[in-house]
A protein has these predicted regions:
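Glycine-rich phosphate-binding/catalytic subdomain of phosphoryl-transfer
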Residues: 26-29, 41-266, 270
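Short glycine-rich, Thr/Ser-proximal phosphate-binding strand/loop in the N-terminal lobe
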Residues: 1-32, 81-88
């Protein structure tokens, strides 16, 4: 969905596109082609609705933001080629990895988190792992392609690897434990090297590039240079949209899956 809001944050137009995930080789995925054709169709629908409602063409905007499904696995090599088809949050083949990491980190690591997908690929001795240059989520991927910036909003990043609330970055302790865990593999990378840079809300996350504008607007009317905010996951976006942003608040999301998001007073501890 593409939503256009005014200066008072009220929706004034929208566009949409319907897509379905595919089960390929036992794993749920969306193709790269489906991602971009869907985004272009969605933006084109928004553009048409704006022209019909207001008689104007969209050429520039105050800002753009990308939100998408959290978690999953999108590894890329140095040539910016995806190494395996996008593995979405729906995949449950990561049981061994999630259990092992939960014990190692003394922290609950769900099946869907990116670190679970990465470690499962390592446990399965998948050949592509040594070639990884960048690992990101769907929102992080789209943002990277339209701005050139390998960054991720702190909410979406927390679904890749736990965040240390004192540093607003990935847990240094967990990063070190993971690197030690896989040291015998002698991969060409360390974990911190391949993860997106973590950004808090409001931080500079780049601008729409000329190439990025063409990826969104096939008609060529959308101009480059528009600021783009840190890309976020659907859960964090939903919490902001429902004003669940303070401690002791939360919200429930019900759609493809159902989950409760809460803001704790302090870091939960294991009894």
């Amino acid at each position: 969905k593409a939503v256009l809001i005014d200066q008072e944050n009220k929706p004034i137009a929208q566009g949409s596109h319907t897509w379905e995930n595919q089960l390929v080789d036992g794993l749920w995925t969306y193709s790269i082609e489906a991602i971009w054709s869907g985004l272009q169709d969605c933006y084109a629908d928004l553009r048409t609705n704006v022209k019909n409602a207001y008689g104007i063409e969209i050429e520039t905007l105050a800002a753009i933001g990308v939100s998408a499904m959290m978690h999953g696995y999108m590894p890329f090599n140095k040539k910016e080629e995806i190494l395996v088809p996008f593995r979405t949050w729906r995949n449950t083949n990561t049981g061994r990895a999630a259990a092992a990491l939960s014990e190692l980190f003394v922290y609950n690591i769900p099946l869907r988190w990116s670190i679970s997908h990465l470690y499962q690929a390592i446990l399965d001795n998948e050949a592509h792992v040594n070639e990884i240059d960048f690992l990101t989520t769907l929102a992080g991927y789209v943002h990277w392609q339209i701005t050139g910036e390998k960054v991720l909003g702190i909410g979406d990043a927390s679904g890749m690897l736990p965040i240390d609330p004192t540093t607003n970055n990935y847990s240094a302790e967990m990063v070190a434990k993971f690197d030690k865990l896989i040291a015998s593999k002698e991969y060409s990378w360390k974990l911190q090297d391949i993860l997106p840079k973590v950004l808090s809300a409001g931080k500079n996350a780049g601008v729409l590039t000329p190439e990025g504008s063409k990826k969104l607007d096939a008609s060529g009317h959308l101009k480059a240079g528009i600021p783009v905010c840190p890309p976020e996951g659907d859960a964090g976006t939903g919490m902001v949209a429902t004003n669940a942003v303070k401690q002791r608040t939360g919200n429930v999301s019900a759609g493809t899956s159902s989950f409760l998001s809460l803001i704790h007073i302090s870091e939960p501890t294991r009894l």
